[in-house]
Amino acid sequence: LSPSESLNGLTIGALYDDFTSPAENSRCIWAVDKGMPSPMSAIGKGYRSTIAPDLFYYGGRKFIRKNHDGTSTWITSTREPGCLSAAPYEAGSKDGCAFYSGTSDAAAQITHEAAKCYDVLNQLFLEETGVGILPESTAILLKAMLTHGASWEPIAEKLSLAMGSSPKQLSKWLGNGIPNIDRVVECTKERITLIGLGEVKIDEGEVFRLPLPVDFSSRLMKRK
């Protein structure tokens, strides 16, 4: 089953971004600007017109080599740039690490961020109910937290110009954007994250009544 056919899973695309800083030269060039969706990552509608991938995250970069005959090829070296990963030891290697890029790297890093969300959620459940997160609720809660803090705000204008569409249309082709984990797990005087959990049947619903903080009611602001 390919990620594009996923219905309930969280599919992850790759941003052309990492924390290395090598420079271009006359033959080795960047494929796209840093921070843009990677050419290695597919975009568009998935199974039954669902949006896939759901989120994007750091997927590393690799240079493109300009050949003498006018063609171009990806450089697949395990040296910088890229995402630093554990790797089998090679001849002459002392650290067992290598630099890779792609959607698998992005998915691995999102898993790491999901673990952060899990620790926060589990602690909240222990404090409020005396027990941790129920196993049957873990996946849906983590998906909600990762997606809730996601947006295209850092590169929305630049990306919309490249695609020839308005920033509001980006989610129809590229999903929910780039997760901001700190925004979800931390609250401020002007921002809170509410977590609701339960089950509803067909034609049923739940009504939540919450007091509005003073800092919210005294000014106009965007709410997500």
Give the role of each language-model region.
Residues 2-5, 48-49, 103-106, 110, ...:
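Active-site-proximal structural scaffolding
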Residues 55, 109-120:
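Alpha-helical metal-binding/catalytic segments enriched in His/Glu/Asp
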Residues 1, 35-42, 215, 219:
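Short alpha-helical segments and helix-capping/turn motifs at coil-helix boundaries
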